[in-house]
Structure formats: C-alpha cells, structure tokens
Amino acid sequence: MEKSKKKKKEENKEEDTIRTYEYMKWNKFQKVHGPEYGLYHFQVPTPQQRKESFDCSGETTLFSKSISHEYTKFYKPMKAPGPNDWLMNHKEYGQTFREYSRFGFHEITRKKKVIYIAPLSFNINPAFDQSFLTAMIILAQDYYYDMIVKLLNINIDLSGVEYRNYEDGSYQLNANTIIEKLFNEMPDDGYCLVCLTDIDLYNNVRVIKPRKWIYYPPPYKNDFCYELNSFKYWVSICSICRFDPLYVVNNPPDDDDMHIKMYFSLLKRSAKLVLKNIGHMFGLKNCIFFKCLMNGFGSMEEFDGRPMEICPCCLRKIFTNISRKFNRLDDNGRVENDKLIYDRFKKIKESLDKNFAGIFEVESKWYQERIESLYLELFIGNKNEELNYDK
C-alpha cells in the first residue's frame, strides 16, 4: 500500500515537472511568473522589433512609406501591462508580417469573398435594431475596403447549446457550442462569418497549468468571454452584452440625452469589437507591438483604451491579403497602388463625419491628421527620401 502511494506520488511529481517545463517555455516577449505577479511578465518589444514587425526596410515604394512614415507619431508602442491586463495573464507570441505571410494567411478567393455579419438573439431597443446593424455593415465596408459586407439572418436552435443559470435569473451560453452551429450557417460565398449577440458568453476550455499555481473554482457569473474565434471554420462570435450600460444599471434613464449617450457608447464599443473580429478572420493574431485595435483585452476598461485603427504591422497584413485578390501586387509581391492607404483613410474619415457625427470625434480627428501627413509626404514631399526608423 505504501509502495503504491509512493509510486503514485512520484508519477504526479513527474507529471507536474513535464507540465511546468512545457508551460514555462520562453518566447521573445513573455516569461512565466507566479500568481503574485500575474501569470506572465510581458517584455515590451524594442524599437527594432517594432520596425521589423511590418518589414518595410529597404522598400522605396510610396505604399511602404505610407505605412511606416511617422509611425512613432501616430502609432503608440505597446507599454508594460498592469497586473490585471491581458498580456500579463495570457500567453501571446505576436505575429510579424513575415510570419503572417508564411503561416497565417487566410486567402480570399473568387468563390469566397463576402464578409457576413449575423445578429443572434438581438434584443436591443427595437428603434435602433436596423440602424445598429446598418452601422456595423457601413463601418466594416469602409474599414476592409473592396470586400463585400452583407447582413446574414440566421436561425440557430439554442436548445442544444450548453448554458449556465444563475440565481438572479440571468444565464450564459457556451461560446464553443455556438461556434460549431455557426459553421453550418456559412453561405457558400462566405469568406468569414462574424456573429454579434447580446447574450452573455463563457468559454469552457481550460488550459493545463501547474497545480500549485491554479485551482478550478465552480462556475461564477464573472467567468465570461467577449469573443471566440475559430481559425478552422473562419467563424467568430462576439458578445456585446457587457458593453451595454444597462447591464450594470438595470433601470433605463428617463433623460433622452443620457439614453442617446448610452446608445452611442454601445455602438462605438460594438463597432470596435466587430472590426477586431473580422481582422482575426483575415488570419491576424492579437497584436503585441503597438497600441492597436487587434490588441487582446480582458476588461471593458482595457478595451476602451484601445484605438479604433490598426497598427502598421496589421495594416500591411490586411492590405497585402486584399491586394492579392484584386491583382494589386507587383512581381515581388508588393502592393502596386501607392494611394491605397491614403484613399482608405480618406474614405473612413468621410464616412465617420457623414454617418456617425458626434460618435467618433476622436477617431475622426486622428484620421484627419493622418491624411494631412500622408498628403504632404506622398504628393508634395520627396518620394525618394530615405525612411528614418530611429526616431
């Protein structure tokens, strides 16, 4: 009996050693700490690593200059995260443009070229339902230029989806089981499908962690997820349940101005979440080089601190992918049309001012400054000027 216990103890010790070894592998930017520091300690990328992430050195085309020009002014570098931030608690390897081109590419084809946005159990104020969804379509169309964006009405039987009930009458759905059902709703011409829901979600996948650092508590209401993506089926589901101010304050405000302000807040957050998930469907992973729309987040405060625009690294990934489909690459695989980024920024700025006046004021100002800077550089300045990455 004692021998069997001793043998079992040795096996458990060996198993923990193997798990710890696998779990404590270093990557370029993270190393493992104990729970008193957060699970991971993020090492901020150096200026050289940020420059190499979008890999424009040595290129003299206006396209490469429009990506990298004054990038230190318009794109803030990623800073050291706090103890509760995403990068301190999740393992992120990052993804350079070169890595994306080799391993993460989700190719656009003639048969699959439509981005679908599908609402699921939408219970927002009926007066805003159609306008809310239309806003998502307009922003996605402007943001991912040349792509076709359509609204897809789906009817998923939620009776077979795993869920949790709570004493206050609320419930959560298992995002993994919904992902499996979404794949069957994808049209034949669908490049990707992003499902937007007002239902609270949770993700029941557990990561193997050393036993001395973690315990598995019973399910509780704050165990939730904002989004879940499948790179196998190219479908995504994102929940705006906790973006709604009424999630915290159950009683709707009597003041009409306050009601409109709350709706604008919900619209802005939802738009950022939808655009981010479409970016994931292009094969982009969470960005770790700059403050970027594609940064991972674990709380609403962290999400609100993220910009609406993607960084130079992610921007080049998107442009190269779309340009490959529309024959805009030269013999070296580089984008030929030098005005693409300028035209995209200008189109987004005009759309924000025309369709969303008063909602995206900060973003509109950023785009205006970016457009003016690019105009001076691309059309007035010296086109053959060497890029300075050492600012």
Residue ranges and their predicted role:
Residues 123, 202, 319:
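Surface-exposed, flexible loop/turn segments at secondary-structure boundaries
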Residues 111, 130-290:
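Metzincin-family zinc-dependent endopeptidase catalytic domain
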Residues 233-261, 265-269, 285-391:
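Metalloprotease/metallohydrolase-associated module, dominated by Zn2+-dependent proteases
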